[in-house]
Amino acid sequence: IRKMHKRVLYENYLNFNTENNSVNLIFPIDLFFSDSELSTIKEIKNSLNKFGFKYVLKEKMLSVLAIPSNCDESKIREYFEDFIQSKINNTSLETDFKIEIAKKLCKRNAYKPKRKLSSSEIEALYVSFHKCKNQKFCPSGARIWESLTTELISKIIKP
């Protein structure tokens, strides 16, 4: 279920329309970062704005004003730490970085393994999943599901 949810979130993030999917915070969240981290955040501002993150850079501080609608407000610092790390690690092309942001967000926001889902949540996930372009792999490359062939069944049941 988690891998399916990651795939759904990932494809939603890649097709994100910030005008409709950004939620303004009632109270801005202030996060303190080092000068080098703030410099990196400044570099990626346009990319993050496209995902629905709205923020103002101040001296030694980042003031977050809006976040994507399906992001958890309590994880904002973790999101920005992930984005900084991704930017530092390698991604220089805009499209590659957009993919990295989408992967980080879906990983943080996917259903947790021990969470019990209601039947309506499972049904909604199933419908959303079948609208995805890629239904075999989650964004990390792990297989979501596998079709059972007679060959595979015989390997599993082999005495």
Task: For every predicted segment, state its role.
Residues I1-P159:
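Long, charged low-complexity intrinsically disordered regions
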